[in-house]
Amino acid sequence: MRRPPLVVMAIVLLSGVAASTSAADTTTTTAVTTTTTTTITKTVPHRRVAALTGRPDPTAVTKRRSALTIKMDNTPQAHPQYGVNEADDVYEEIVEGGITRLAAIFNSNLPTIVGPVRSVRRTDREIVFPIGGVFAFSGGAQYAISSIETAPVTLIDQSNAGAAMFRDLSRPPPHNLFANAELLMKEGGRVHSPPPLFTYASRKVPAAGAPVGSFTVNFLSGFATSYQWDGKTRTWLRSIFGAPDVTATGVRVAPTNVIVMSVNYIGGVGVEGSYAQMVGSGPVEVFSDGRLQKGRWFRRNIRLPTAYRSASGKVIALRPGQTWVELLATGETVSVYARP
């Protein structure tokens, strides 16, 4: 872990920023027609493919910079958010009180406004350890900071970010801290390009699994998140708090893939100081290319990315694009609905 020297934070007041207010062991399903699965060939990202999305990277720009993970607020007061649609991958985790927060990982794009930015939690160490690079956050309790300090990342918070973090006074605190990803990346020191977190399928090979119209990740405390398949864009249209999830720039949040991992929260679900145990194995539901594959996730140690395998033991391959990973507590459910 490398942490830059502390400097006085420069607070930039952006009055012009828009201020619009805003898997599991048990799965509830309606009738979903299962089709014959086909083998998807495993592909490994090479120097012309972005490691964190599997998309073409003809200039290899993603190989010349580290990954940047920014901790984001996800409460109703934090919406609409900035920059989440430009992340390569996003992890959604449960924190105290059962609410969720996001860890958005940037490598392909470096938006000038990301946020709102919030504090670190112990689960973040589990997420970023194999990724490395830069981890940006607002601050945090000492136990959480001590945890993230053991990860191989450069830590940047509002005390040493300088102009890379700023407050929008048109929004109420603490939901008004934002970050400039490009400036944060410049504080990251030596480049450590990230490893691939997922296996991607060839576009020529049909997707495996049962066709799905929509599904809901049943987080507690009113944070249930729904996704609806859009065949035109081949993405999952995300909704939260009973409404479409739309960014502050008017873009619908629509990941290419959604992975729902069923994990144990050590210390209790929604309890302060608890964290998602992401080393070991557990049930997983993978939604990609309009289909669902059930299987298990495996992770041998914290330094390695998670592996995902189907019920038959085959590697689950994703469609290249943005991936969301939902860290659902063991015992919470996913409701799956057939296509109309």
Residue positions per predicted region:
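C-terminal region of N-terminal signal peptides and the immediate post-cleavage residues
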Residues: 15-35
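A surface/extracellular/periplasmic glyco- and lipid-processing/surface-interacting theme
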Residues: 32, 37-89, 96-340
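Bacterial N-terminal signal peptides that target proteins for export
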Residues: 1-8
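Bacterial N-terminal signal peptides
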Residues: 8-16
